[in-house]
């Protein structure tokens, strides 16, 4: 079990993570919709993850969402790197009712984000612009190359949840053990 903590003047975060788990989640960030997305991610990535966060949500949820992305990325970095004997690449298209989102990832040890989800406004009290902030923090702290591409959909909740689940399935596929892969790069290092 990997454990990473981070404490700033804005947030206090602890993440415990087992990369090859059973999809068990214990999430408490103080942001209900975000907790729901992280639970979906954990379940479909087949990782076990505990996240606790105390943040300055009396201001807004920005610091909590972004900083949790940082710490989850750092925990996954500890669990995955150096990359050896895994697939490295993963992709998935996930649908949720009318919504469809495609995710492509490369455990390249290079942070990069392509975020093409046409969402704005709120889901309940949650500012959906924070979704991109989470994925950026996640991608650059893991680090990995992450593309999230909108295919269709109208319901913001469904689009966002499809994105989190697509990332989960892509990650599960990328970290699948392949003893023949060695270091999956022509460079000999990632």
Curated annotation (Swiss-Prot):
What is the annotated localization of this protein?
Cytoplasm
EC numbers, comma separated = 4.2.1.19
Highest taxon listed in the record's lineage:
Bacteria
Q: Name one Pfam family in it.
A: IGPD
**InterPro entries per record:** IGPD_sf (IPR038494), ImidazoleglycerolP_deHydtase (IPR000807), ImidazoleglycerP_deHydtase_CS (IPR020565), Ribosomal_Su5_D2-typ_SF (IPR020568)
For this UniProt entry, the molecular function terms from Gene Ontology, in alphabetical order, are: imidazoleglycerol-phosphate dehydratase activity
Pathway info: Amino-acid biosynthesis; L-histidine biosynthesis; L-histidine from 5-phospho-alpha-D-ribose 1-diphosphate: step 6/9
Keyword terms, alphabetized: Amino-acid biosynthesis, Cytoplasm, Histidine biosynthesis, Lyase
The catalytic activity, as recorded, is: D-erythro-1-(imidazol-4-yl)glycerol 3-phosphate = 3-(imidazol-4-yl)-2-oxopropyl phosphate + H2O
Q: Which GO terms describe its biological process?
A: L-histidine biosynthetic process
Q: Give the family this protein belongs to, as stated in its UniProt record.
A: Belongs to the imidazoleglycerol-phosphate dehydratase family.
Protein name in the entry: Imidazoleglycerol-phosphate dehydratase
């Amino acid at each position: 079990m990997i454990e990473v903590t981070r404490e700033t003047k804005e947030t206090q975060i602890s993440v415990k993570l087992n990369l090859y788990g059973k999809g068990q989640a214990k999430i408490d960030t103080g942001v209900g919709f975000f907790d729901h997305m992280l639970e979906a991610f954990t379940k479909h990535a087949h990782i076990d993850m505990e996240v606790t966060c105390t943040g300055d949500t009396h201001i807004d949820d920005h610091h909590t969402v972004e900083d949790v992305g940082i710490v989850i990325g750092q925990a996954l970095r500890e669990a995955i790197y150096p990359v050896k004997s895994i697939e490295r690449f993963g992709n998935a298209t996930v649908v949720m009712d009318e919504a469809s989102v495609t995710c492509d990832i490369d455990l390249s040890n290079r942070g990069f984000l392509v975020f093409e989800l046409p969402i704005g406004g709120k889901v309940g009290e949650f500012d959906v612009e924070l979704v991109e902030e989470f994925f950026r923090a996640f991608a650059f702290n893991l680090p990995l190359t992450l593309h999230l591409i909108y295919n269709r959909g109208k319901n913001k909740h469904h689009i966002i949840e499809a994105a989190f689940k697509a990332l989960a399935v892509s990650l599960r596929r990328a970290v699948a053990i392949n003893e023949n892969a060695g270091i999956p790069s022509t460079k000999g290092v990632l």
